């Protein structure tokens, strides 16, 4: 009798222990998938949120604070950004240019508007060849100047060696990247035809000097051409811009806001 009672108690304890172990194992197995599922959901949610931020940032197409599209300030401006095309001294589109949209600092754009108003009264509208220029484009110019490519030599630097352009015309930094420098000419308001200045944009040579008169490999700069260059220079100077003597098309805002800052956001 005592032996039977002992066996009965032993079997009862064994059954209880087995049941408890089974429940623990089942609980452990049900918890593991729940934890993994939660982690996966968090990871996916985080990844999706980052992608949305990137897409939204690109879609906004916004400019850094203090910069504007010139067209928004001067609606009748003609834009022909040469470095957004192959029609330039390199013969290829410059890095950083993705659209034909001139960009300037607010201060430069407002001063340019004042100049445009005076020129309009004289029968002209402004045409922009270049304005803000990304640093990536400037670096592209430097790489080009050190390469063997001379496909456009006859049209842009017929009397100069390509290597001599670096330092004199091309440098590792450009005032354009500060956002307050513009390369421009004028067109007749009624027809939109470009005024003949006696020499084209980005010609590397003496014929591009504002006061030059005489013959050069691509033609001749006459006294009338010089008068038009000087008229443009006088108007731009009156409205706060500073010219340079060797490029009749080049003007920088005297009181530019970013004298020591060079930007590298794309033109788009």
Give the location of each predicted region.
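Bacterial N-terminal signal peptides that target proteins for export
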Residues: 1-7
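Bacterial N-terminal signal peptides
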Residues: 8-17
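Extracytoplasmic cell-surface/polysaccharide-interacting catalytic and binding patches
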Residues: 20-131, 139, 143-246, 255-268
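Segments that shape or occlude catalytic/ligand-binding pockets
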Residues: 134
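Conserved metal-phosphate-binding beta-hairpin within the catalytic cores
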Residues: 251
């Amino acid at each position: 009798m005592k032996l039977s009672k002992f066996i009965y108690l032993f079997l009862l304890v064994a059954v209880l222990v087995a049941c408890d172990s089974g429940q623990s194992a089942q609980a452990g197995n049900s918890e593991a998938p729940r934890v993994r599922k939660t982690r996966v959901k968090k990871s996916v949610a985080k990844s999706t949120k980052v992608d949305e931020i990137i897409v939204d940032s690109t879609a906004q197409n916004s400019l850094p604070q203090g910069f504007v599209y010139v067209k928004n300030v001067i609606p009748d401006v003609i834009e022909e950004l040469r470095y957004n095309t192959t029609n330039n001294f390199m013969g290829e589109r410059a890095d950083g240019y993705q659209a034909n949209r001139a960009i300037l600092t607010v201060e430069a754009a407002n001063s340019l508007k004042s100049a445009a108003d005076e020129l309009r009264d004289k029968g002209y509208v402004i045409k922009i060849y270049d304005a803000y220029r990304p640093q990536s484009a400037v670096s592209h110019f430097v790489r080009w100047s050190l390469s063997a490519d001379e496909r456009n030599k006859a049209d842009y630097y017929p009397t100069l060696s390509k290597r001599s352009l670096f330092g004199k015309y091309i440098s590792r930094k450009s005032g354009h990247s500060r956002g307050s420098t513009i390369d421009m000419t004028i067109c007749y308001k009624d027809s939109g035809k470009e005024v003949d200045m006696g020499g084209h944009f980005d010609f590397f040579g003496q014929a591009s000097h504002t006061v030059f008169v005489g013959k050069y490999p691509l033609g001749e700069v006459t006294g009338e051409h010089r008068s038009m260059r000087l008229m443009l220079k006088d108007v731009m100077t009156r409205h706060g811009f500073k010219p340079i003597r060797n490029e009749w098309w080049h003007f920088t805002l005297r009181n530019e806001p970013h004298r020591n800052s060079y930007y590298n956001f794309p033109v788009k």
